[in-house]
Amino acid sequence: MLTYLRREWQSFGETVTIKNTFNAQEDNNQSGRKTDNRPVKTEGRYCYKADVNRSKYYHDVQGFSLGQSDLHIDPTQFIMYSGTISNGISYVNQAPSCVQLSLKFTPGNSSLIEDLHIEPYKVEVLKIEHVGNVSRATLLSDIVSLSIAQKKLLLYGFTQLGIQGLTGDVVSVETKRIPTPTQTNLLTIEDSMQCFTWDMNCANVRSTKQDSRLIIYEQEDGFWKIVTETLSIKVKPYFKAYGTMGGAFKNWLVDSGFEKYQHDLAYVRDGVTVNAHTITYVNPSGKAGLQQDWRPATDYNGQITVLQPGDGFSVWYYEDKWQINQAIYAKNFQSDTRAQGYLENVGTLKFKMNYIPAFAEIRNKPGKVNYAYLNGGFAQVDASGYTGMSIILNFVCTGERFYASDNNSRVDNKITPFISYIGDYYTLSGGDFYRQGCCAGFAAGYDDVSPEHGITVSYTVMKPSDPDFITGGENYGESITSDLEVSIRNLQDQINSIIAEMNIQQVTSAVFTAITNLGELPGLFSNITKVFSKTKEALSKLKSRKKTSPMPIAATSIIDKTTVDVPNLTIVNKMPEEYELGIIYNSMRTKKLIEQKKHDFSTFTVATEVKLPYISKATNFSDQFMTSISSRGITIGKSDIIQYDPMNNILSAMNRKNAQIINYKIDPDLAHEVLSQMSTNATRSLFSLNVRKQLHINNSFDTPTYGQLVERILDDGQLLDILGKLNPNSVEELFSEFLHRIQHQLREY
């Protein structure tokens, strides 16, 4: 079966034909249109019998400036800043005209400017003028008078150099235009710094209409139309956590993370309702808490996933009122945004232990993380109700990473608000030291969080000049990849349950089942290659989401696209690989399925992913290669048997003098060279060099000489003979290597 499946899958390919059932009614309606509305192609262009209506575009734009000025854009557009303040930030990019600005400042507990403490306040700036050598600001405030720190924070932000001398906790500002003042305390402040100047009154009043959408370039040529557009959008990332409690009594947190989540929103832009959608992809790498497999199944165990500084998340945005609809190409994405904020865990922990409510709570510490906009671009999105072009906005989590690798990290009040933990109190008794496993960041286990940002973007798209051409958009039906996402999630849950429930007794039982029942594998069935391929694809997607250490070569997997049947040039009487695959598969198959004599093909497919050691005679290595690795400090010249184990990139050699096995940790590049040397004359086997040696030394009736030991180790017939005579209870410790190998593979997903 194994050889058949391997060769069939390596040559497997298919063409999927999707029948469009979503728009059948609409297609019938389209066919009934009058031909009068159809365009007529004339000399390479589409012409209409009726007059073509052209939209009127406004040019009174609010707040956007490209990095490189476009000839179609006024490079002196006025921009206001809202967000977290840092040194160098200005609230406006130039002197405004005829405006009244409202600024609301929210400092932290220990925010300082030039070593002066800042209190929260709100002002409405009416005008700033130069009087002699000073700048004088006329404003209204929610307090009777401003402190020196509040004055400096306000006026520095209206200079070309921006804020200076800001230290301590984060300070945020919300800046916006207001039609009429609302505060009552009229104040006048002065300083020698050179500020932007303006007056709220204007002699020539411009139109008050401020459009947030502008077509700045349009060209139509034959089949295609090229459009450049500037657009203000509202973006709402959505962070939705998930998790799985596993283990014998469902008290262990075996998986957690953030879903790829589609969020729908509607907002008004220029008096028109915009139906927008965001899809949020989160890439967390942190873990809080401790993984302690020795804990009893009645106790809590497990780590919670944490989005920590240095990690990122992406927001895919699309809507129904922009030029990207029906576009097939896009370029020149630009944005002036400085969007930033923080994600903070709110609400109670979602996960519970399997006890009555009074005892089901898990001790935890919610955390948070700051983030900032990084860059943006375009992508093709295949989402619920829409297939077409979207923009991607990438954000990065900022700040300094922190993880307590032991119990000796002293508590720091500056980072404590950011700390996440699960399973116990986050500090040791006394509260002076963080508990091992504390991690700074936003944990995946609390209520949904959805911050909001206003962002201005510009882009150029190419779309059909004939509107009858459809390239995607809301007319498309449900994503054809949604079923795959569901199967991936189910597969992830299944793998997590296997990790939590596997034990050495199950592995030992699988060894002896394989010997007596030729592996006990699922039988062949119709369509097996297609099902196998789909599951392999899901496993590949799962693995791509985790940061795993690089592998030197894929051929160490039992079945992979690059795997071939391994020649039996090293081990004589080689046991069928079905035996070894059966050990792995039945170690993962649930006890209930084994008792019912039922099979789980997903588990079988996962079993084929396990990477096995390669064993070879030392004489099979070239002299040149032996000299090469000796120069790297690896001495295997006086050995008879050499093994490479992909689990930890370990090269092992059995010493000729006393049969001692010497292990060398090697890097993936050298491992690739070793495997290249072994590929034509080695044997892949679940039974490693160490397991083979221990079986023959500890379970033989005689004490073999070194020569006899080498001969027996490389003979699977004698190995199976010994296994057939053993008591399962006496070799559990020896087979713990199998358990560790399987768990190591499963944790890659």
Swiss-Prot record:
Q: Glycoprotein as a keyword?
A: no
What GO cellular-component annotations does this UniProt entry give? Answer: host cell endoplasmic reticulum-Golgi intermediate compartment; host cell plasma membrane; host cell rough endoplasmic reticulum; membrane; viral outer capsid
Superkingdom, according to UniProt? Answer: Viruses
Alphabetized, the UniProt keywords read:
Capsid protein, Hemagglutinin, Host cell membrane, Host endoplasmic reticulum, Host membrane, Host-virus interaction, Membrane, Outer capsid protein, Viral attachment to host cell, Viral penetration into host cytoplasm, Viral penetration via permeabilization of host membrane, Virion, Virus entry into host cell
Which residues does the UniProt site feature Probable cleavage point to? 206-207, 213-214
Q: Does the keyword Membrane apply?
A: yes
Its Gene Ontology biological processes?
permeabilization of host organelle membrane involved in viral entry into host cell; virion attachment to host cell
**Which family does the record assign?**
Belongs to the rotavirus VP4 family.
**HAMAP family, from UniProt?**
Rota_VP4
Please report the name of this protein according to its UniProt entry.
Outer capsid protein VP4
Report the source organism.
Rotavirus B (isolate RVB/Human/China/ADRV/1982)
